[in-house]
Amino acid sequence: MLDGGMVFTREEGWKEMKLGRVFKGADIITVNKNRHEITNSQYVAHLGSHHLFLEKLEHELLPITNKTIIADGATWIWNWANASYPEATQILDFYHAKEHLCDYAQVQFKEQAEKHKWIDEQCLLLLNDKVSDVIQNIKEQKTITKTKQQKQSLLTYYTNNSKRMKYKTYRDEGLLIGSGPIESAHRNVIQKRMKLSGQRWTIEGAQQLANLRVLNKSNQWGSLEKLIKMAA
């Protein structure tokens, strides 16, 4: 899983800290039908270029077979996945897909009841591998001036990602369909320590602290302690 969040730097203002979370299917515990817990994860973080971030991430992916990549639809992520892991299962985060749908419906429908009913119907179709039906239903909505651009944007987003939106199939295979674990990881690994009130980081300092946070949350703190003892 991959995601980005902003930290405030002295040199460049707000700058994206990219975070990757790698875990095995065996580390996912089902608490109930709507909740899962991940017992062990490896993290990587990088402030800046996605090329350097991906180099770090690929190191953690090496031992993983039958890879699954869940992301929000950023083009650079899918380009990387297609080039580096063409055999991997790619999944568009369901909740981002729903968010785009809701944003469109918010301006398309005047009546709240009608809006919610339409959204629920489309989400049910998505969860049953019927993204093509949803695309057709969006096309059939009357185009009004204020939604023309948003409608086309939604259609493009769904069409470009349709092969990554087989949510029933993924669930039947025991796969996650949401990027909640990486979003919560960003809060826990990065933001909880690096977005406190008044904080401004040098780029170098932010990266160094992120490296320490990643080691800690990946249960690799012991390796750092060994290096310190060896250097003492």
Can you say where each PLM-predicted feature lies in the sequence?
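Catalytic center-proximal scaffold of phosphoryl-transfer enzymes
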Residues: 1-232
